[in-house]
A protein has these predicted regions:
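Active-site activation/catalytic loop segments of kinase-like enzymes and analogous catalytic loops
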Residues: 209-239, 251-269
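Conserved N-terminal boundary motif of the eukaryotic protein kinase catalytic domain
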Residues: 16-24
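ATP-binding pocket architecture of kinase catalytic cores
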Residues: 23-131, 153
Length: 272
């Protein structure tokens, strides 16, 4: 992670009056996301630091999803010296993670997932060819980069190869999907509906069953019934999913995330 001085300097090349630059309260494992306030009108912006290739890919996929009326941040790529980052106005609302922590009812959670299924169906219609030749256009490459950054090269390669295996399929099953639809990446607006899906790193070319399995893994952790989720999607989309494969992917994903969390904790302890 960059030093705070470097972060402040980079942010202020774009927003000179930026202040209160800090990490969000709810964040993932990468520790590369920051929020600032404008010293002029108090408006807030989100900055995510990454490689130039990842930032440019994220800017493009955000545009592709937005063109399908899928709510995502208006990502703009920016560079300051050797540092690259994406920036967008902070989305009003709270993460689904926060809402669940504050006692969101199971019925309301199911309502959010019903909206997610509609968005997932829209993703299946996106032409992914414009990003095919870009670096990090494939979901296993995204996994390799992010897991390596959080853990190490060995874990990055291990997870990348596992994703390659789970992500296999025929050409007609591939699409441009958000493969990280978790409660931390879903922003709920004041009306109780989805205001945005965030973390454009996770948007990549993927097999439909793999992407659905990644989303279903978290639903399973919330005590949801994956079969019901699959049946609902097939009803609203008219598409058939591979139930057995999705169950396998969800189970492997939940085991893998637990292992990665333990490895990350071990790394943090050794760095102290």
């Amino acid at each position: 992670m960059q030093k705070q001085f470097d972060i402040d300097t980079a942010v202020k090349t774009l927003h000179i009056g930026a202040c209160e630059i800090s990490m969000p309260k709810i964040r993932g494992a990468q520790n590369n996301v920051f929020i600032s306030k404008s010293g002029i009108d108090g408006s807030e912006y989100v900055y995510k630091f990454n490689s130039a290739e990842m930032v440019l890919k994220n800017e493009l996929v955000a545009q592709m999803l937005d063109a399908r009326n899928i709510p995502v941040p208006r990502v703009v790529a920016h560079s300051a010296g050797h540092q690259w980052f994406e920036v967008y106005p902070k989305i009003p609302g709270r993460t689904l993670y926060e809402c669940i922590g504050d006692g969101m009812t199971p019925d309301d959670i199911d309502g959010v997932y019903a909206d997610i299924l509609d968005l997932f169906a829209q993703m299946s219609k996106i032409d992914w060819r414009p990003i095919y030749k870009m670096q990090y256009s494939q979901t296993h490459d995204v996994v390799k980069a992010n897991v390596t950054g959080v853990n190490n090269k060995f874990m990055g390669k291990l997870y990348s190869e596992a994703v390659k295996l789970m992500n296999r399929g025929s050409n007609e099953t591939y699409g441009l999907y958000h493969c990280g639809i978790t409660p931390k990446n879903v922003i709920i607006g004041h009306d109780g509906h989805i205001a945005a899906l965030v973390d454009m790193d996770e948007v990549a070319i993927a097999n439909k069953n793999y992407a659905f399995g990644m989303m279903a893994a978290k639903y399973q952790q919330l005590r949801g019934n994956i079969n019901t989720l699959i049946d609902s999607y097939e009803f609203v989309s008219g598409q058939i999913l591979d139930k057995k494969r999705i169950h396998t992917i969800s189970n492997i994903t939940n085991f893998g995330k637990r292992l990665m969390w333990l490895m990350g904790r071990r790394k943090q302890i050794h760095q102290r």
